[in-house]
Amino acid sequence: MSVSIKPLEDRIVVRPLEAEQTTASGLVIPDTAKEKPQEGQVVAVGPGRVAENGNRVPVDVAEGDVVLYSKYGGTEVKVGGEEYLVLSARDVLAVVTK
């Protein structure tokens, strides 16, 4: 899925994935008690940063990847009624493979 945001340099746009809404015992977790999601799907990737020697360093993630990111990293933006997070590639901790 492509969004109308084109990130610059080593930034990526992530759609946060909602965490489980109920506990294992079936209790529903209210919105006020939920943690910020730290997992999301990459929907756009910048071209990479330019190194001191002038070469472009590509970003390690691609569109469609599911990533884990820093809890308080990035900037929240709303586009077309959907919420996204613009992160630096350095805020991505891991790529999730299932």
Swiss-Prot record:
GO terms for biological process: chaperone cofactor-dependent protein refolding. It is found in: Cytoplasm. The keyword Cytoplasm applies. One of its GO terms (cellular component) is cytoplasm. Keywords: Chaperone, Cytoplasm. InterPro entries: Chaperonin_GroES, Chaperonin_GroES_sf, Chaprnonin_Cpn10_CS, GroES-like_sf. GO terms for molecular function: ATP binding; metal ion binding; protein folding chaperone; protein-folding chaperone binding; unfolded protein binding. Its main location: cytoplasm. It holds the Pfam family Cpn10. Transmembrane segments: none annotated. Heptamer of 7 subunits arranged in a ring. Interacts with the chaperonin GroEL. Belongs to the GroES chaperonin family. Together with the chaperonin GroEL, plays an essential role in assisting protein folding. The GroEL-GroES system forms a nano-cage that allows encapsulation of the non-native substrate proteins and provides a physical environment optimized to promote and accelerate protein folding. GroES binds to the apical surface of the GroEL ring, thereby capping the opening of the GroEL channel. This is Co-chaperonin GroES.
